[in-house]
Amino acid sequence: MRVIVDGDAAMYKNDICQLTLNYQIEMFVYLDYAHLLKDAPYPVIECEIGKDSVDMRILSDLKKGDLLITQDYGLAALALGKGAYVLHISGLKITSQNIDELLLRRYIGAHQRKS
């Protein structure tokens, strides 16, 4: 198992890093070139700047059994389909049992914001 961190979970990278070090688990952080970190104590996977470019790279590299940490429910749904485990940055475990409700809430929220 590896821990894959979507760059959007940026505020918790150091905490996640400490946990992965304690449990001797590999951790990779995916960021686009506009958000690169200098001297990070973990591997940073650099992605092109663009809509969903980081998400597409994560999906390309993600393996069954990996743990993805993200706040993107769309990415979470696709990761579940690849057999990965998914945690929201709030700590919520995202599963096949709750992803539909989370995606529906996202859709309704976006629709309300447009109104």
Regions found by a protein language model. Name each.
Residues R2-S115:
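Nuclease catalytic cores that cleave nucleic-acid phosphodiester bonds
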